[in-house]
C-alpha cells in the first residue's frame, strides 16, 4: 500500500484506533510458554528414554524403540526453538508498532491544523492572513509526510517480523499399515468365533426342545387307562371275597392278619400232621394212621370237587379245623391291642356265614385298623 497517497487524517486514524501492541505482546507471551513446555517435554522424554534403554530394558526391542523415538525428541527440541523464535518475532512486531505509533501524529493535532486553516481563510478579507495560511499549509504537509514515513517504517518492520521459519510436523514413527493389519487379524479371528458361538447356540436349542417328546402327550392316556384297569380288578376281587366269604370258608387268605398270636397249624390244614409228629412222642401209630387216612381221603376224593355254597372249589380248599392254642411264652408274640372285630364282606353286600369248624374267635375284617397310643410324657 502507498501510504503517501493517504492524508494524515487517515493514517493517524488507523494507527490510533487499532488494537495496539497489546495483542502482539500477549501472543509473544503465549509463544514463550509453548516454547518452554516443548523444551521441558523434550528433556523429560529423552531422560526417560535413556533410563529405560540403559537400565531396565535391553535387547533388540529396546534398541529399535530408541532408534524410533530419537527423531521425535529431536523434533521437540526443534519445535521449541522455532516457537521461541516466533515469540521474538511477535515482540519485534510489537516494537515496530510502538515506533510507528510514536511517529504518527495524533488525529486531534491534524484536525486542529485544518480548523486553523479554515479560520484564516474565512477572515482573510484584505489578504492579511496570506502568510499564516501558507504556514498552516506547510505544517499540514509536514504532517502528511511524517505520517506516511511512520507507516512506511511500520510496514517494513512488520514485514521483517512476519518472516518466520515454518513449522514441520513430526515424522511418522509407527507403521501406517499396522492398523489395517490389526483390523484384518481381528476380523479373521472373530469369524470362526462367531461361527462357533452360532453352532453352540443351535445345539443348545436342540437339547432344550427334544424331538422325541410328542406335543399332545396322548401317551399318558394309555398309562392312566392301565392304572384304572388295575384298580377295577382289585375292586372286583374285594367284592367276590366279601360275597362268598372266601376268607372264612377257605382259610387261605389273610390268615393271621388280625392277631399272629392266635394262628394255629390247623388254620393251614396241617394240624393232624403236627400232632402226629409232636415232640417226645415220635410218630405214633395213630399219627401214622391219621396221615394214611389223610392220604386215603385225598385219593378217595379224586374226581370230585368240594363245594362252598354254589361254588366248586378244589379238594385242598376244605375248611380246616381249628382249635384253641395255649398261651405263648414271655419271649414270644403278645396279643396286639386293637379295635373290635369287623364283620366280613363288603359294606351293603350279604356275606356267607363262617364255617362251623372255625372254633377260634378270630374273624377276618377289612379296612384300616385304628390304634390308639398313649400320650408320651416327652410330648409335654
Swiss-Prot record:
GO terms for cellular component: cell outer membrane; peptidoglycan-based cell wall. Changing residue 90 to D: Resistant to 3bMP1 compound. Defective in uptake of propionamide, glucose and glycerol, and is unable to grow on them as the sole carbon sources, but grows normally on hexanamide. Keywords: Acetylation, Cell outer membrane, Membrane, Transport, Virulence. Changing residue 94 to T: Resistant to trehalose analog 6-azido trehalose, but not to 2-azido trehalose. Normal growth on trehalose as the sole carbon source. InterPro entries: PPE_C, PPE_dom, PPE_sf. GO terms for biological process: cellular response to xenobiotic stimulus; D-glucose transmembrane transport; glycerol transmembrane transport; lactose transport; maltose transmembrane transport; modulation of process of another organism; response to host immune response; response to starvation. Changing residue 147 to A: Resistant to 3bMP1 compound. Defective in uptake of propionamide, glucose and glycerol, and is unable to grow on them as the sole carbon sources, but grows normally on hexanamide. It comes from the Bacteria. GO terms for molecular function: channel activity; D-glucose transmembrane transporter activity; glycerol channel activity; glycerol transmembrane transporter activity; lactose transmembrane transporter activity; trehalose transmembrane transporter activity. The modification N-acetylmethionine is found at residue 1. It is found in: Cell outer membrane. Induction: By glycerol supplementation as the sole carbon source in the minimal growth medium. Disruption phenotype: Unable to grow on minimal medium with trehalose or glucose as the sole carbon sources or in limited medium containing trehalose. Resistant to trehalose analog 6-TreAz. Slow growth on minimal medium supplemented with maltose or lactose as the sole carbon and energy sources at both neutral pH and acidic pH 5.7. The supplementation of glycerol or glucose promotes growth at acidic pH, but reduces growth significantly at neutral pH in minimal medium and on solid agar. Belongs to the mycobacterial PPE family. Interacts with PE19 and PE25. Small molecule-selective channel required for the uptake of nutrients across the outer mycomembrane. Transports glycerol and glucose. Involved in sensitivity to M.tuberculosis growth inhibitory agrichemical 3,3-bis-di(methylsulfonyl)propionamide (3bMP1). Transports maltose and lactose disaccharides. Plays a role in response to starvation and stress, likely environment within the host. Inhibits canonical autophagy in infected mouse RAW264.7 macrophages. Inhibits autophagy and enhances intracellular bacterial survival when expressed in human macrophage-like THP-1 cells. Inhibits Toll-like receptor 2 (TLR2)-dependent signaling leading to autophagy inhibition, increased intracellular bacterial survival, reduced phagocytosis and reduced secretion of interleukin 6 (IL-6) and IL-1 in infected mouse primary bone marrow-derived macrophage (BMDM) cells. This is Transporter PPE51. It comes from Mycobacterium tuberculosis (strain ATCC 25618 / H37Rv).
